[in-house]
Amino acid sequence: MLKKLGVLLSAIVLVIASFFVTVTPALAETYTVKMGSDQGLLKFDPPQLTIKAGDTVKWVNNKLAPHNAVFDNSKVPDSVSATKISHKALVFSPGESFTTTFDEPGTYTYYCEPHRGAGMVGTITVE
């Protein structure tokens, strides 16, 4: 009888304890990409970035404005609309920014329209 009572109490304690044990999901992170390097070069800094699905990239106007970040449909995953994630509006003021959250894994190549010819191109890899 005592053995059965001990097993029953142990089971009850385990059930109650399970309510207090939770798995914390990975928190999404925000990464910053500077538009224009600190040295005054026409480039994204960093030019390549690897993030996780659900993370956000914040583009910040740093130097040599104006800048934007535009994606081509041929250089994003098939399930993603380049138009929806592009920021075609130019930013002019230092510190001005915009963000994009990347939900789909894959490789995303983007560029700054005014400075594409100067090589201002970047790549984001979403795992």
From Swiss-Prot:
Signal peptide boundaries:
1-28
Q: How does it sit in the membrane?
A: Peripheral membrane protein
Q: Which cofactor does it need?
A: Cu(2+)
For this protein, the record's Pfam families field holds: Copper-bind
GO MF annotation: an example = electron transfer activity
User: Where does the Plastocyanin-like domain start and stop, copy by copy?
Assistant: 29-127
Binding-site residues, Cu cation:
H67, C112, H115, M120
Q: For this UniProt entry, what is the primary localization, expressed as one broad class?
A: membrane
Q: Could you tell me where this protein is found in the cell?
A: Cellular thylakoid membrane
Which superkingdom heads the taxonomic lineage of this protein's source?
Bacteria
**Is the keyword Phosphoprotein assigned to this protein?**
no
Keyword Electron transport appears in the UniProt entry: yes
GO (cellular component) term, any one: plasma membrane-derived thylakoid membrane
Keywords of this entry: Copper, Electron transport, Membrane, Metal-binding, Signal, Thylakoid, Transport
Sum up the protein's function in the record's words.
Answer: Participates in electron transfer between P700 and the cytochrome b6-f complex in photosystem I.
Q: Which family does it belong to?
A: Belongs to the plastocyanin family.
Q: NCBIfam families in the record, alphabetically?
A: cyanin_plasto
What name goes with this protein? Plastocyanin
Q: To which species is this protein native?
A: Gloeothece citriformis (strain PCC 7424) (Cyanothece sp. (strain PCC 7424))
